[in-house]
Amino acid sequence: MMAPYAIAHLKIGLKLYETGYRFNSDQRARIYLTNALEPNEDFAGTFAFAIPALAQEVEAVNLVKEKKIFTVVIGNPPYSYHSKNKGEWISNLISDYRYVNGEPLGERNPKGLQDDYVKFIRIAQNLLDKAGVGILSYITNHSYSDNPTYRGMRKHLMQSFEQVYFFDLHGNSKKQEVSLNGNKDENIFDIQQGVAILLTTKKSNSNNLSNVFNAELWGSRSEKYRSLNISTITSSNFNKLSPTNPYYLYIDQDTTLRSEYENFLRINEVFTVNSMGITTGNDGKYVGFNNLELERNPAFDPSMIRDVAYRPFDNRSIYYDASKI
């Protein structure tokens, strides 16, 4: 990612120049080229001969990762459900989110915890825990507000910070979200995934759970931009929540009937035999509404096309080649 690294140096350098600030000959903007999801490692010798400047960068960033204390972490980390950042160091940090109240989540597919934005939240939390004080402010995917897979993450954040503000900007076209008044709800970015602003504050390391606040913003993109330009913590109508076991939700939810719901039979107690069924990984390619649709693919062997109960009351055709699905 050399291009954004160079552009960041250029823009910050120009902005500082506009203010009258001048760098000394041995000074630089403290922007570093590194993967924050990896620990400090000594690659300087690898680059010293071929790319001396990069070797110096490695030495500088290793010093930052090892010695520096951070009290403010801000950003818009990437959202990548199929994360390629699977190093041992970050995986060990994320493992804390796989437990709630000392017990494993027990989720069949907790893959959402491997999303890159979750890892960046975990890193920020780790940095501020080391500092003992600080502020975290990210704009990220908003899925962790109520999804059961993230309940360990929500509880863990509540244990680290004194205040947690969750500002849901919605705009999730995957869920076909609409505004409360029925009008169209738009994303502030050109993406399908809904987003939210997370703001947390930490004044000391404490054993008490944090106060959690929630606010929401619906409407068109222009309306959201207009509101965000003038909004502050005190003007955004945050509601104080009381997240409780077992889900620790970051949304305002009516829990009047929860105890009755929790005491009812679970679905796996009613239906004792179950399975995930067929998972193709690419239904658009391997599942069709009829045999003819799949037979049009010249790469498919017609003898492997089968009828399938795709969904309840939804019978379709599937190319059932075990080597591919």
Predicted segment positions?
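SAM-dependent methyltransferase catalytic region
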Residues: M1-F167, G171, K175-Q176
